[in-house]
């Protein structure tokens, strides 16, 4: 029997493993010998190797250098039993520094880092655009004054510059005011009013400097008029002054909660004193409801106490000179006080008895005198009598006498009639001329 090579239905690709001849059976078909069995096993291994190699090369991934040493000495389970050439290729790639990782490991790593990679790509794309980078820079608080672009000159005419300035100023001012009105969109919420105003003005000037390098003061006034920058709350204007009205300054700035805290610490009498300082302080007191209620109650209580303890609450206080109605008020007041003074004198005379002298009697009456009154001796009993020089009236204070007379005519006191009908009081001695007059000088010359 002649020997011929084994013929299979599927001829595998050429491999490094050589096929050995096989014997032919009695039926005319070749008997699979040991070499043929080895060939078939090699074929299956080769096919598996080709499949696995292609799958691995389709999913290559570079690993960090720290993991190279660990992966060089490691042979994956799917390469066991494969051909020597594939194992050599695997070892060669691992020595270069780009080891092959299992497809399962590659799939797990890509799934775990997929979200992170997308975020990085999104951030990188946003940072690549110059417009968004400039917007990100302007959102931070830089110390740029806004005048750095004034050196840029443009060849535009004055008419074009004016029209472009108006359009650009309207857009920039509207965007700045939108940032002011919507605090959620404004990045720096904790800016002081001065820094806030500085940022808006500088950004507006920086945008308009390319069109017109000149500073337009009308534009600044319009920014101040449109935007609510709270510049009235700026502190430091009164620094260095000796006297500062703190309450008035707080009232002008609208800090009513601070004023309410201050007024709550004051007592009712202190609130009365606050109202007497100035009209502004009284307005501050009237603006606070709680403090004003306490103040009004204190005023009512003080007035009631004054009316209760004042001996002359029914009339006005006595003064030296009054209007023509003073005589009527005097007569009304004297009738009410006449009985009280007489009872006091009688009680004092009974207590002291014989030791009560004339001097003590006059001194006791003198304690009850008013500002425009004086003491005189009664024309009937020589007892102390009160004398009013404005009314020309004297009243005896002795209980047994009580004579009320006119000092001009020495008659009973008359309020409506004149003293012309009665006899006038004649002086007991003639009064000489006043010193320094012509008559006194003549008398001196005669002497």
UniProtKB/Swiss-Prot annotation:
Zn(2+) 1 binds at residues 378, 381, 396, 401. Residues 437-447 are annotated as: Sufficient to suppress UBE2S activity. Residues 261-409 are annotated as: Requires for efficient binding to CDC20. Changing residue 345 to A: Substantially impairs inhibition of CCNB1 ubiquitination by UBE2C. Pathway: Protein modification; protein ubiquitination. Changing residue 375 to A: Decreases UBE2C-mediated ubiquitination. Changing residue 145 to N: Not mitotically degraded. Shows impaired interaction with BTRC and reduced phosphate incorporation. Residues 261-339 are annotated as: Sufficient for interaction with RPS6KA2. One of its GO terms (biological process) is positive regulation of cell population proliferation. Residues 337-358 are annotated as: Disordered. The keyword Phosphoprotein applies. Part of a SCF (SKP1-cullin-F-box) protein ligase complex. Interacts with BTRC; mediates proteolysis by the SCF ubiquitin ligase complex leading to activation of APC in late mitosis and subsequent mitotic progression. Interacts with FZR1/CDH1 and the N-terminal substrate-binding domain of CDC20; prevents APC activation. Also interacts with EVI5 which blocks its phosphorylation by PLK1 and prevents its subsequent binding to BTRC and degradation. This is F-box only protein 5. It comes from Homo sapiens.
């Amino acid at each position: 029997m002649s020997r011929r090579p084994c013929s299979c239905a599927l001829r595998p690709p050429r491999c490094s493993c050589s096929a050995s001849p096989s014997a032919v059976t009695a039926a005319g078909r070749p008997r699979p010998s040991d070499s043929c069995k080895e060939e078939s096993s090699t074929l299956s291994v080769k096919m598996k190797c080709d499949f696995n190699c292609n799958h691995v090369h389709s999913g290559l991934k570079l690993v960090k250098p720290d993991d190279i040493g660990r992966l060089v000495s490691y042979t994956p389970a799917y390469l066991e039993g494969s051909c020597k050439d594939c194992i050599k290729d695997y070892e060669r790639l691992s020595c270069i520094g780009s080891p092959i990782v299992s497809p399962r490991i590659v799939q797990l790593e890509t799934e775990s880092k997929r979200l992170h990679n997308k975020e990085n790509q999104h951030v990188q794309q946003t940072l690549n655009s110059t417009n968004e980078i400039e917007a990100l820079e302007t959102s931070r608080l830089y110390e740029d004054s806004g005048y750095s672009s004034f050196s840029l000159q443009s060849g535009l005419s004055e008419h074009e510059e004016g029209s472009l300035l108006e359009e650009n100023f309207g857009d920039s001012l509207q965007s700045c005011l939108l940032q002011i009105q919507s605090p959620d969109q404004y990045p720096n919420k904790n800016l002081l009013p001065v820094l806030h105003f500085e940022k808006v003005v500088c950004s507006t000037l920086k945008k308009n400097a390319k069109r017109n390098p000149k500073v337009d003061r009308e534009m600044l006034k319009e920014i101040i008029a449109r935007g609510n920058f709270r510049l009235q709350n700026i502190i430091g204007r009164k620094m260095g002054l000796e006297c500062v009205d703190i309450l008035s300054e707080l009232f002008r700035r609208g800090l009513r909660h601070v004023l309410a805290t201050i007024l709550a610490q004051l007592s009712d009498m202190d609130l009365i004193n606050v109202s007497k300082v100035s009209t502004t302080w009284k307005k501050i007191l009237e603006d606070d409801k709680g403090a004003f209620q306490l103040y009004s109650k204190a005023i009512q209580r003080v007035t009631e106490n004054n009316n209760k303890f004042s001996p002359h609450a029914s009339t006005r206080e006595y003064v030296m000179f009054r209007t023509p109605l003073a005589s009527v008020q005097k007569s009304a007041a004297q009738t009410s006080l006449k009985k009280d003074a007489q009872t006091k004198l009688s009680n004092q005379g009974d207590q002291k008895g014989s030791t009560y002298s004339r001097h003590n009697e006059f001194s006791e009456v003198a304690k009850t005198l008013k500002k425009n009154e004086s003491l005189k001796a009664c024309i009937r009993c020589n007892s102390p009598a009160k004398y009013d020089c404005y009314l020309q009236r004297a009243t005896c204070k002795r209980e047994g006498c009580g004579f009320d007379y006119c000092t001009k005519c020495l008659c009973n006191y008359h309020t409506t009639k004149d003293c012309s009908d009665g006899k006038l009081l004649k002086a007991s001695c003639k009064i000489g001329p006043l010193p320094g007059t012509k008559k006194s000088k003549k008398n001196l010359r005669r002497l």
